Amino acid sequence: MNQPCNSMEPRVMDDDMLKLAVGDQGPQEEAGQLAKQEGILFKDVLSLQLDFRNILRIDNLWQFENLRKLQLDNNIIEKIEGLENLAHLVWLDLSFNNIETIEGLDTLVNLEDLSLFNNRISKIDSLDALV
């Protein structure tokens, strides 16, 4: 089985990674080309897919204030952090990571679907605010 993550260095989410992901996942036809030329505003992005990127830390997502779906599965994330500004998030996938504590989710009051399977969870914290 091909597993490209093992050969890559651990990565932190930076502007370049996010711009590349947004560009790759945006519309590919003429409208998409226009958006790439003019620059896509992160606040306009509703869905972001960052799976299989060897991400070690969640970071630089504060600009995605209207994000509704975030896919961070199959990385090497150890801690749930950097999500406090994503109040509109409805769907979050953090499965297949190295997370030990469920934390940092208390501001995600619209969260409906949270996937955390296949992690190293031993402690659950700060879920009281969530319905």
Where are the language model's segments positioned?
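Extended, charged alpha-helical interaction scaffolds
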Residues: 110-131
